[in-house]
A protein has these predicted regions:
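Short, solvent-exposed loop/turn segments at secondary-structure junctions
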Residues: 11-12, 66, 97-99, 180-184, ...
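Active-site-proximal beta-strand elements of phosphoester/diester hydrolases
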Residues: 7, 176-178, 223-227
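Extracellular ligand-binding/catalytic regions of CAZymes and related secreted enzymes
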Residues: 1, 23-26, 33, 185, ...
């Protein structure tokens, strides 16, 4: 049995946005039927004790990032680093992909292959269309789809190889979700800072990687997902399938041939929401 730990960040943003607890509980429920996988979800930004990480095969964080990133408190970078050194997996979702250059970014680059960098990357809300996918377990059963989300672009990626033959001594990289923002998206305004950034505008026409996966030389795995801002997007079956597949894969469990199956009732999106002010 492989153990996956899902960590939900503390409440933030208006209702329906950054619903970390509700999102991780949905993911936990959908993964319950995957053979060989045990999933534990924790609220409040971290696990209750070191033993949880020590017993995990993978840790995935869905939380606010930047200077308030859960990894930057206490010796959590060290705890996850120990997991990585024994071949464990790491996943970062949405804002959790942002780490300061001087605090945590280098570690995250080594673990998951890249990060959102303040003033280099940007965070527009736009409708991304995903039409083609690489051959990879994470894309099994995933069909073309589109969602409007705060899809970060111009992610800062570490050195990697996309040639997957004879490259076991380097980190291998797969662009799982790619889409092309139009010039209006690049020109902003972004969510914050509003921009625009000249280097982002100058890259007009370029395809952007908004979800990726890596396999490290020690066979440990990682992934990053820049979307996940709007809770309602869990209602999109293709979006949730690609994320569920990533959670299974990063833990070292075989992804089903047609991807992880999930069902959803309308009320499911209303459960476990954080109490937030609407004013």
């Amino acid at each position: 049995m492989r153990n996956l730990v899902l960590i939900a960040g503390r409440p933030s943003h208006p209702p329906g946005q950054h619903e970390f607890r509700a999102g991780t509980r949905l993911l936990q429920r959908w993964l319950a039927s995957v053979p060989g996988l045990s999933v534990n979800a924790y609220d409040g930004g971290w696990v209750p004790d070191h033993g949880v990480i020590e017993k995990a095969h993978a840790v995935v964080i869905f939380a606010d990032g930047g200077r308030g990133h859960p990894l930057l408190e206490d010796d959590r970078l060290g705890d996850v680093g120990s997991l990585v050194r024994r071949g464990g997996g790491v996943g970062l979702m949405h804002y959790a992909t942002e780490l300061p250059v001087d605090a945590g970014a280098a570690e995250v680059d080594a673990w998951v292959g890249g990060h959102y960098e303040d003033r280099f990357s940007c965070n527009p809300i736009w409708n991304a269309r995903f039409e083609r996918f690489p051959e990879h377990p994470i894309t099994r059963g995933v069909e073309p789809f589109e969602t409007t989300d705060e899809w970060y672009i111009n992610v800062r990626f570490a050195a990697y190889s996309t040639s997957h033959q004879g490259t076991r001594d380097v980190t291998r990289f797969w662009p799982i979700l790619v889409a092309t923002p139009n010039e209006k998206v690049r020109a902003g305004p972004y969510v914050w800072p509003h921009g625009p950034y000249a280097h982002v505008v100058a890259a007009a026409g370029r395809t952007e990687v908004v979800m990726w996966a890596v396999e490290r030389p020690d066979s440990g795995r990682g992934f990053g997902l820049t979307g996940g801002h709007f809770h309602e997007n869990w209602g999109n079956p293709q979006f949730r399938k690609v994320v569920l597949n990533a959670l299974v894969w990063v833990t070292g469990v075989d992804v089903p041939a047609h991807g992880v199956l999930s069902d959803l009732e309308l009320d499911d999106l209303r459960r476990d929401l954080d109490e937030k002010s609407t004013s």
